[in-house]
Amino acid sequence: MSVKIRLARFGAKKRPFYRVVVADSRVARDGRFIELLGFYNPMLPKEHPSFLKVKVDRLKYWLSVGAQPTERISWFIKKGLISTEAA
């Protein structure tokens, strides 16, 4: 079983809203997930406090046990939008 940290799409047509989830890679994009880590709203400006919220401690846990982040989640981490540094 390959576990991925990825975005699951919600919201209305042309008004996307994403949940950051941990899911088995074989499950559909918006299907069953193991754990909800946070959310991402691309319709808001980056400075808005609700633009991207993630439970950092749980993200660190899943990365430590081998979960693979998708390209977009990796991009968030590299850009510093999700901090994985020790607090």
Swiss-Prot record:
What keywords are assigned to this protein? Answer: Ribonucleoprotein, Ribosomal protein
Q: Which GO terms describe its cellular component?
A: cytoplasm; small ribosomal subunit
Query: Any keyword Ribonucleoprotein?
Result: yes
Q: What protein does this entry describe?
A: Small ribosomal subunit protein bS16
The record ties this protein, via SUPFAM superfamilies, to:
Ribosomal protein S16
Q: Which organism is it from?
A: Ehrlichia ruminantium (strain Welgevonden)
Name of encoding gene: rpsP
- Return the InterPro entries for the record: Ribosomal_bS16, Ribosomal_bS16_CS, Ribosomal_bS16_dom_sf
Q: Which Pfam families match?
A: Ribosomal_S16
Q: Name one GO biological process term.
A: translation
One example of the protein's molecular function in GO is:
structural constituent of ribosome
Upper lineage is: Bacteria, Pseudomonadati, Pseudomonadota, Alphaproteobacteria, Rickettsiales
